From Swiss-Prot:
A zinc finger (unnamed) spans 3-34. The keyword Signal does not apply. GO terms for molecular function: ATP binding; DNA binding; zinc ion binding. Binds 1 zinc ion. Negatively regulates transcription of bacterial ribonucleotide reductase nrd genes and operons by binding to NrdR-boxes. One of its GO terms (biological process) is negative regulation of DNA-templated transcription. Belongs to the NrdR family. Residues 1-22 are annotated as: Disordered. Its cofactor is Zn(2+). This is Transcriptional repressor NrdR. It comes from Rhizobium rhizogenes (strain K84 / ATCC BAA-868) (Agrobacterium radiobacter). Residues 11-22 have a biased composition (Basic and acidic residues). The gene is nrdR.
């Protein structure tokens, strides 16, 4: 594993243990060259998922992009990184275990909304406003009501 501080290729694992969600291994590493310490996570990838965008274009699912979406919605909100990681891991686990190799971006968006609703109401509204491209104040009320109804019915069925 490359050191994120100095770029050295030779880092050592000092501690390994299951992460809180039991879907990954948390490893504490140290770089013998610069003394930098950092944490990595190792996960099982069950299958490669393709995301079907609104335009019909297909792209490889990117877990990091999902994490960034949560981080943007939760910016300056009092939500621990561990809770974000558990939410993302839960979504990825559901997607991978669904049996599908292709999933629409809308289905992923609904799962993100469902997770954000339980994490932070403000983040939920932030994400919904971008997800549904709000242009008027009324859009906030209308779309949140609609999304809540969809999530209550079935979070996997848009």
């Amino acid at each position: 594993m490359r050191c994120p501080y100095c770029g050295s290729e030779d880092t050592q694992v000092k501690d390994s243990r299951p992460a809180e969600d039991n879907t990954s291994i948390r490893r504490r590493r140290i770089c013998p060259d610069c003394g930098g310490r950092f944490t990595t996570f190792e996960r099982v990838q069950l299958r490669e998922l393709m995301v079907i965008k609104k335009t019909g274009r297909k792209v490889l699912f990117d877990r990091d992009k999902l994490v960034r979406s949560f981080e943007i919605a939760l910016r300056k909100r009092p939500v621990d990184r561990d809770r974000i990681e558990r939410a993302v891991s839960g979504i990825v686990r559901r997607l991978e275990s669904s049996g599908e190799t292709e999933i629409s971006s809308e289905q992923i968006g609904l799962q993100v909304l469902e997770a954000l609703k339980s994490l932070d109401d403000v983040a939920f509204v932030r994400y919904a406003s971008v997800y549904r491209d709000f242009s008027h104040a009324e859009d906030f009320e209308n779309v949140i009501t609609e999304i809540n109804a969809k999530i209550a019915r079935d979070p996997l069925d848009p």
